[in-house]
Regions:
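Carbohydrate-associated surface elements
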Residues: 151
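Active-site rim/loop-helix segments in enzyme catalytic domains that contact anionic ligands
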Residues: 1-106, 135-139
Length: 151
């Protein structure tokens, strides 16, 4: 029986570096996979941290996300725009709600996400938000959560 997989990554390319090998195999074996990218991925190194200043680069990055995910036949990509390397400036509940919205739409059986003790703050918060969004409830679809590290 095929399963639905949801990759939840803090930044563009974390999904590629973290779990694409495993997910590619699972898709090849008949499972369906989806990706949720939480952060915009560009502004942390910009002096003013302005999304407006990085608009052209962000558009290119979004096309690259689509291209990379199409390589392993990701069915749909969801992109949020939380501030790059500043998830700690966002209420955890806002990140949890973004995850819940996607989770409720696709009802995944399996989630791949960041390792809880990763050094990157966005990765830590992503893990925490995933665990919160998948807490044991009677109608919870997620049966397995796998963590990956991005080195």
């Amino acid at each position: 029986m095929s399963k639905k997989i949801l990759i939840i990554a803090a930044h563009p390319d974390d999904e590629v570096l973290g779990c694409f090998g495993a997910v590619a195999r699972m898709v090849k074996e008949g499972d369906e996979a989806y990706t949720l990218i939480l952060g915009e991925g560009k502004t942390s190194r910009d002096e003013r941290r302005s999304v407006e200043n990085k608009k052209a680069e962000l558009n290119i990055l979004n096309r690259e996300i689509e291209k990379a995910n199409s390589v392993i036949n990701i069915k749909k990509i969801f992109i949020e725009h939380f501030p790059d390397n500043r998830f700690d400036s966002v209420d955890l509940l806002d990140i949890v709600k973004a995850i819940l919205k996607v989770k409720e739409e696709i009802k995944p059986d399996i989630i791949f996400t960041h390792y809880e003790n990763d050094l990157n703050i966005d990765h830590q918060i992503t893990y925490q938000a995933v665990v919160t969004a998948t807490r044991p409830m009677e109608d919870e679809s997620v049966k397995e959560i796998y963590s990956f590290e991005v080195l």
